[in-house]
Amino acid sequence: MSETQPAKPAAPRRDQPRTHHGDTVTDPYAWLKDPEDPATVDYLKAENAYTESRTAHLAGLRKAIFNEIKGRTQETDLSVPVRKRGWWYYGRTEEGKQYGIQCRLKADGDTPPEIEAGTAVDGEEILVDGNALAEGHDFFSLGTCDVSPDGNLLAYAVNYSGDERFTLRFKDLRTGED
């Protein structure tokens, strides 16, 4: 007995000219950029239904691959500390949390601190906690982070929309205020 498979969807072309710096480009699929347009939603639902129907037989394999990758991923981890202007800077991740945490620790000589993943570090200063910044947002990406030469200000970039346009923020590391 064969099941009826959905037809392969084809996005209709709707030529939409756009002029930038005197050059006009016509994008026949620009209408798909609007996530609120019912036509976009309907098309994506059709794409998803088609893909699901064509790959349903792979569900077990998908789950096995996911579990293998997850099993090989060390969720609680940390980067190698880097010494800069009297501080050790490093990033760490924690199991069950999606985003990294950028930290620093006052340097006591040239020997890196003994930091163990998943263990609290005395004197650690959290510069940016991606998990806290992402809270309440559907999307989050942390861009660059850099500390001023005197170690008192942090410049970091965040993106909450996924459009790759980051907002530059500043944090006073003496007070913790943005």
Q: Where in the sequence are the language-model features?
A:
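Beta-propeller folds
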Residues: M1-D178
